Curated annotation (Swiss-Prot):
Encoding gene (name): dgcC
Major location (coarse): membrane
Places the protein is found: Cell inner membrane
Residues engaged in binding Mg(2+): D248, I249, D291
Gene Ontology molecular function terms on file: diguanylate cyclase activity; GTP binding; identical protein binding; metal ion binding
Cofactor note: Binds 1 Mg(2+) ion per monomer.
Record flagged with keyword Glycoprotein: no
Pathway(s) it belongs to: Purine metabolism; 3',5'-cyclic di-GMP biosynthesis
Designated name of the protein: Probable diguanylate cyclase DgcC
Length: 371
């Protein structure tokens, strides 16, 4: 039974399992990023070093070294990859620690190249593994630093041990080296693919978070206004129709005060769903904040927009909120068709806002068109 080694990754996993979130501080995020980096390096290191055990062992058999070299080889190939992970995962700064581990890999690799007498094929396999790891983890800067460490380590080993340089590889050494030469690049490519896929998904999520309203899933105001500006410019350029709607839930403050904010949130989500069900997929829905929504209906005259909103009104008449079926949602809508005389998209927005004010002043639960 091995003792459970407590580290920060265990802490984050334990907190998630109990429904707790660790404090979101820059330090914690840096630490978690470092742990993810160390975990990505762990598998390639373990496979690469284990795969080099037989090629190195075959060269040692041809000129037997002292017995302790075999212990060092076993420890390097099968213990060091897991020890390096534990060192990095328990470090205050896992990223810096793992970079140090990679440099240690380079030093040890250079040592083994020297011990093998620079035997050409096993040394080439070792060089390939180290170069891929260094370049993939730290780019050209870490690659050059690691390469220098390997060369220096190899030269020092040759000098201290007095081993004769022999570039020739026996057939056995060729056959034992070929599998790792073929397999390791495939493994490295697979790990890189997995990392790229996760990064792309992370980027997509960040993009959604930056453009969508968290409660309803429709566009937030900042992104929606960007789309409105683009639509305004395109319609003016191509002389195309478009209609802008601003929608407000009637007596929303009263709903909040009477039934609570949870019911208010239900009302906002219910209106969002009704708009999504009733309007076209090409209509751009955005939440302005609170209970106010806006819709861009591209290629649509005001009459068609009014007809669509009549269907929304009818749908809301039969809609009941799950926890408060006695509440009936009513909305006021301001409709503003694009006017060629408008010089800025904010004039269009103001026109729809004035139409909304007109609908509220006329008694609410209605749709009004800008004059």
């Amino acid at each position: 039974m091995f003792p459970k080694i407590m580290n920060d990754e265990n802490f984050f996993k334990k907190a998630a399992a109990h429904g707790e979130e660790p404090p979101l501080t820059p330090q914690n995020e840096h630490q978690r990023s470092g742990l993810r980096f160390a975990r990505r390096v762990r598998l390639p290191r373990a496979v690469g070093l284990a795969g080099m055990f037989l090629p190195i062992a075959s060269t040692l058999v041809s000129h037997p070294p002292p017995g302790w070299w075999w212990l060092v080889l076993v420890g390097w190939a099968f213990v060091w990859p897991h020890l390096a992970w534990q060192i990095a995962s328990r470090a205050v700064d896992p990223l810096s620690r793992e970079i140090y581990n990679l440099k240690t890999d380079a030093v040890l690799a250079g040592m083994w190249v020297g011990v093998m007498g620079v035997n050409v094929l096993p040394s080439t396999a070792m060089l390939m593994i180290m170069c891929l790891n260094l370049m993939g983890a730290g780019g050209p800067r870490l690659f050059v630093a690691g390469l220098v460490l390997m060369v220096v380590s190899c030269l020092v080993t040759l000098e201290l041990t007095g081993i004769t340089v022999s570039f020739n590889s026996a057939p056995l050494e060729w056959w034992l080296s070929l599998p790792i030469i073929v397999i390791y690049p495939l493994l490295f490519g697979w790990v890189s693919y997995q990392t790229a896929t996760k990064l792309a998904e992370h980027k997509r999520r960040l993009q959604v978070m930056s453009t969508r309203d968290g409660m309803t899933g429709v566009y937030n105001r900042r992104h929606w206004e960007t789309m409105l500006r683009n639509e305004f410019d395109n319609c003016r350029r191509h002389n195309r129709d478009a209609t802008l709607l601003i929608i407000d839930i009637d007596h929303f403050k009263s709903i909040n005060d009477t039934w609570g904010h949870d019911v208010g949130d239900e009302a906002i989500v219910a209106l969002t769903r009704q708009l999504q069900i009733t309007l076209r997929g090409s209509d751009v829905i955005g939440r302005f904040g609170g209970d106010e929504f806006a819709v861009i209906m591209s290629g649509t005259p005001a009459e068609s927009a009014i007809t669509a909103m009549l269907r929304v009104h009818e749908g809301l008449n039969t809609l009941r909120l799950p926890n408060t079926p006695q509440v009936t949602l009513r909305i006021s809508v301001g409709v503003a068709p694009l006017n060629p005389q408008m010089s800025h998209y904010r004039e269009w927005l103001k026109s729809a806002d004035l139409a909304l004010y007109k609908a509220k002043k006329a008694g609410r639960n209605r749709t009004e068109v800008a004059a």
